């Protein structure tokens, strides 16, 4: 039997068993928009997950443009990215993500707000897929901090720093201290579509892995489960390796998004679905994360790496937001033609 490689730093003691744990990777019910109202009065961003890239933008951006470089994991901020065989102007405009309220009388998740998505797949014979993803790459290391009603991230307090918790942990897209994945579960509402569903995750090395959860050919809520076929329960059959603890990243997983696939043999057109959460069961990479030294406070290596990643992200996300703003400003606001004088008189006569 092929031995599984365990990414851990555990002591090699006889009789030690793998310690499994369960965590919610992302819970869309926590991602409701609750701050920063738009012109119509609707909230636009999720307080806990606001990221402001303006502080890292260069001087070529105006203050107005920098104000656009703020985003969050609020459900309405998520995007649908179609592959080349599915991408066309009509499909691009129709495919979108919304914050969907579950009815009060529902048997599951009554009254909660979840992620709802519509994808317009091609109707001709063509393999196609759609990625449902956040507007930005979820950061693995973002110190816990408070956010005010205007979306300004406050400086973390000493207590928040000492907690060791990140802003994107506890159901907001990041789970740390993950060794070997044992199982993944997705709560989704199906409507008898024959499409396949994948969960995409990024590990501590920046590699993105996809896990096939099954087909969406069912009606109502269902928990789709992926079980690791290479998972070995007996630690004596495992190959254990020791890795440097710092400054290497603690093994973790970050949610990258969903992928919905449409086979050319199946009917195309609209797909509509709903997602509540993603959960994982995993072996801990390290039995205890309590250390004698505050390594990151002393050396700041991971913080510098994260800052560099953010600067790269600004080049993509910030410019994209500015271009979208410019396009919005150029949109025609007229709903019809201004009538000429003769046409006006003719309408009055009628």
Curated annotation (Swiss-Prot):
Keywords in alphabetical order: Bacterial flagellum, Periplasm, Signal
Entry-linked Pfam families: FlaA
Chief localisation class: periplasm
Protein localization: Periplasmic flagellum; Periplasm
N-terminal signal peptide: 1-20
Gene Ontology biological process terms in this record: bacterial-type flagellum-dependent cell motility
InterPro entries given in the database record: FlaA, FlaA_Spirochaetes
A single cellular component GO annotation: periplasmic flagellum
Its job: Component of the outer layer of the flagella.
Assembly behavior: The flagellum consists of an outer layer composed of repeating units of FlaA around a core that contains several antigenically related polypeptides.
Protein's name in the database: Flagellar filament outer layer protein
Species this chain originates from: Treponema pallidum (strain Nichols)
């Amino acid at each position: 039997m092929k031995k599984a490689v365990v990414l851990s730093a555990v002591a090699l003691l006889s009789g030690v068993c793998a310690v499994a744990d369960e965590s919610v990777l992302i819970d869309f019910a926590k991602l409701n928009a609750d701050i920063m109202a738009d012109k119509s009065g609707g909230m636009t961003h999720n307080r806990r997950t606001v990221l402001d890239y303006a502080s890292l933008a260069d001087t070529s951006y105006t203050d107005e443009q920098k104000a656009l470089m703020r985003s969050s994991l609020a459900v309405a901020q998520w995007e649908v990215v179609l592959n080349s065989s599915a991408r066309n102007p009509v499909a691009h405009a129709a495919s979108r993500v919304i914050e969907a309220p579950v009815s009060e009388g529902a048997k599951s998740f009554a009254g909660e707000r979840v992620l709802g998505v519509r994808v317009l797949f091609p109707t001709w014979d063509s393999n196609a897929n759609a990625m449902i993803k956040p507007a930005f790459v979820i950061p693995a290391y973002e110190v816990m901090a408070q956010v005010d009603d205007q979306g300004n991230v406050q400086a973390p307090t000493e207590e928040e720093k000492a907690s060791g918790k990140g802003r994107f942990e506890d159901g907001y897209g990041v789970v740390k201290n993950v060794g070997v994945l044992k199982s993944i579960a997705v709560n989704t509402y199906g409507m008898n579509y024959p499409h396949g569903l994948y969960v995409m995750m990024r590990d501590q090395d920046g590699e993105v892995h996809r896990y096939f959860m099954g087909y969406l050919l069912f009606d109502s809520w269902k928990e789709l489960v992926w079980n690791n076929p290479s998972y070995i329960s007996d630690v004596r059959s495992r190959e254990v390796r020791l890795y440097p603890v710092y400054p290497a990243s603690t093994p973790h997983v970050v949610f990258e998004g969903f992928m919905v696939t449409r086979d050319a043999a199946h009917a195309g057109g609209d797909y509509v679905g709903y997602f509540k959460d993603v959960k994982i069961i995993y072996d801990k990479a390290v039995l205890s994360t309590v250390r004698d030294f505050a390594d990151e406070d002393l050396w700041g290596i991971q913080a510098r790496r994260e800052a560099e990643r953010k600067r790269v992200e600004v080049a993509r996300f910030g410019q994209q937001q500015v271009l979208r703003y410019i396009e919005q400003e150029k949109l025609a606001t007229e709903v019809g033609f201004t009538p000429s004088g003769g046409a006006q008189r003719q309408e009055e006569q009628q």
